[in-house]
Amino acid sequence: MAWRRREASVGARGVLALALLALALCVPGARGRALEWFSAVVNIEYVDPQTNLTVWSVSESGRFGDSSPKEGAHGLVGVPWAPGGDLEGCAPDTRFFVPEPGGRGAAPWVALVARGGCTFKDKVLVAARRNASAVVLYNEERYGNITLPMSHAGTGNIVVIMISYPKGREILELVQKGIPVTMTIGVGTRHVQEFISGQSVVFVAIAFITMMIISLAWLIFYYIQRFLYTGSQIGSQSHRKETKKVIGQLLLHTVKHGEKGIDVDAENCAVCIENFKVKDIIRILPCKHIFHRICIDPWLLDHRTCPMCKLDVIKALGYWGEPGDVQEMPAPESPPGRDPAANLSLALPDDDGSDDSSPPSASPAESEPQCDPSFKGDAGENTALLEAGRSDSRHGGPIS
């Protein structure tokens, strides 16, 4: 389970990294550029010929051009003077009509031209050749009160602004009537507009779709693996439980000191390679091989066969398929007159030294074989201590 948790953690970090990448790309200005522009304050003033009153209005309704110096300008308003009524001021020889109050001459003036017909740069250069102090372009009628960015690189230090169509037509009509109109231009509010370029939008969309596909594929793979692993764990636990019940039918014997025991040619456990000691609990397989119980039970749970002769112990007990696929066989009954819990003994030397080697009597703690402690929990579950004795006509004592 640990490696699966690590795999899930790595996958989650990958998804998080992709999400952070997409968010970073979506931050305004991350892949695009910032647009900075300034609004213009437009102040117009004139004398109404009917009432002889001065009329003036101030509004922040203009917008400076991209290449225009952000500074103020002042002068009388002049409009293109052409026989055909060309108000766009595109022709190189365009002349401007500037009504002057009181017949004064050589006063600073501001060119008012309509948008269209040529580039912004051409309009500005034509007015600059006529010594205009500033150029005011009014937008087309279809845009209403909207002003748009203007690109006019290479026009020098002349002030260039754009005003809306209604505002431009209002001033134009006054000038065409011969009314002198004075315009004062001031610097308005600074605006910063950040945006993402079209290529960045496409890139972010592709990255997001890729992230979603990878995340979905990883989640599907993860949950399929988790489902399969959970199913195998449940099946394995059920199988081990049934196998423990079958192994519990094998006979158990307790080693006693000083008694002649069963006729088995074995002095030690083939699993832990330790000699059998007093009070050791051993298990005898159908093939007559003996092992420590805490050593052989975990082995049989995993392999089902005798470690020495490879006999299938489960089949030898009458289970031809998986332990859970057949019914349990009844445990063998003990012979009449015998206590089924009686201990059988293994041949060990007496204390008087009559045998070749006489190991000292071991305490219960010392006589326990040094098998893997992790096996003890599995080996102790569902284990039945079945002990039976048989009489030997020759010795009159316990035999194998």
Swiss-Prot record:
Per UniProt, residues of the PA domain are 67-175
Task: Provide a Gene Ontology MF annotation, just one.
Answer: ubiquitin protein ligase activity
Do you know which Gene3D superfamilies this protein is assigned to?
Answer: 3.50.30.30, Zinc/RING finger domain, C3HC4 (zinc finger) (3.30.40.10)
* Cysteine-cysteine disulfides: none
Q: What is the organism of origin for this protein?
A: Homo sapiens (Human)
User: What kind of membrane protein is this, topologically?
Assistant: Single-pass membrane protein
Describe, by residue range, where the zinc fingers (RING-type) fall in the chain.
269-310
Map out region (Disordered) in residue numbers.
Answer: 325-400
Where it sits in the cell: the answer is: Membrane
Q: Where is the composition biased (Low complexity)?
A: 356-368
Compositional bias per record (Basic and acidic residues), positions renumbered to this chain = 389-400
Q: Which InterPro entries does the annotation name?
A: PA_dom_sf (IPR046450), PA_domain (IPR003137), RNF149_RING-H2 (IPR042712), Znf_RING (IPR001841), Znf_RING/FYVE/PHD (IPR013083)
Q: What class of enzyme is it?
A: transferase
> What is written about domains in the entry's comments?
The RING-type zinc finger domain mediates binding to an E2 ubiquitin-conjugating enzyme.
Transmembrane region positions? 201-221
Q: Which Gene Ontology cellular-component terms appear in the entry? A: cytoplasm; endoplasmic reticulum; Golgi apparatus; late endosome; membrane
Name of the protein in its database record: E3 ubiquitin-protein ligase RNF149
Q: Alphabetically list the UniProt keywords.
A: Glycoprotein, Membrane, Metal-binding, Phosphoprotein, Signal, Transferase, Transmembrane, Transmembrane helix, Ubl conjugation pathway, Zinc, Zinc-finger
- Described purpose of this protein according to its UniProt entry: E3 ubiquitin-protein ligase. Ubiquitinates BRAF, inducing its proteasomal degradation.
Reaction(s) catalysed by this chain, per the record, are:
S-ubiquitinyl-[E2 ubiquitin-conjugating enzyme]-L-cysteine + [acceptor protein]-L-lysine = [E2 ubiquitin-conjugating enzyme]-L-cysteine + N(6)-ubiquitinyl-[acceptor protein]-L-lysine
**May I ask which residue range the UniProt record assigns to the signal sequence?**
1-32
Glycosylation site list: N52, N145
